[in-house]
Amino acid sequence: MSEPARPPGWLPKAEFDSIFSRVPRLCVEVVIVAADRGVLLTLRGIPPNVGTWHIPGGTVLFAEPVVEAVKRVARYELGLNVDVGELLGYIEYPSHYNNGLDSPVGLAFRTEPIGGLPSAEQLPDGCAWFSRLPAGLYEEQREFLAHRLGLPPDPA
C-alpha cells in the first residue's frame, strides 16, 4: 500500500525538527468567539502539552498563503469551513524555546464558521466553548485571550 499524498511543503519529522530547532516557525491560530458562548478551544493531542486546552492552530506550510493556512487548520482541527477575519495579533511562545523546543510565532485571526456557529453537540471530540479561560490553557494563549478579548480566568 502506498503512502497518502503529502501537501506541498510537507517535511519528514526529522527534517522539520532540524529546521525549526534553529529558526522561528510561523503558525496560525483560529480564534472563534461567540458572545453567548465564549471562545472555542481544543484539547492538544500532540506534544508538547498533550491534553491541555489551546487555541486551534498549526504551522503555515511552505508557499501557503496565510489565509489559506487558517482555513486548512480550521478544517483539520475543527471540521469547520471558516471565513477569515481580523488579525487579532501575534502570540510568541517562550515556554517552547525556554524548554529546548522550537520557537513558534502564531498569527491569531478572528474567524467565523460558514453556516453559523456549531453547537456543543456538533463539535468534534476534544472541542468546547469557554466563557472563562480554563485552567491548563497555554499560558501565552491565556494572556493573549485575556488581553485581546477580555475573557476572565475560570475561578476554579
Task: Tell what function each PLM region has.
Residues 1-29:
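Acidic, metal-coordinating catalytic segment for phosphate/diphosphate chemistry
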Residues 24, 66, 141:
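Hydrophobic (often cysteine-bearing) scaffold residues that line and stabilize catalytic clefts
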Residues 38-77:
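Conserved Nudix-box catalytic region and its N-terminal flanking loop in Nudix hydrolases
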Residues 81-90:
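A short coil-to-beta-strand element that immediately follows conserved catalytic motifs
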Residues 91-117:
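Active-site-adjacent beta-strand/loop module that shapes the phosphate/pyrophosphate-binding cleft
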Residues 108-110, 119-151:
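NUDIX/MutT-family hydrolases
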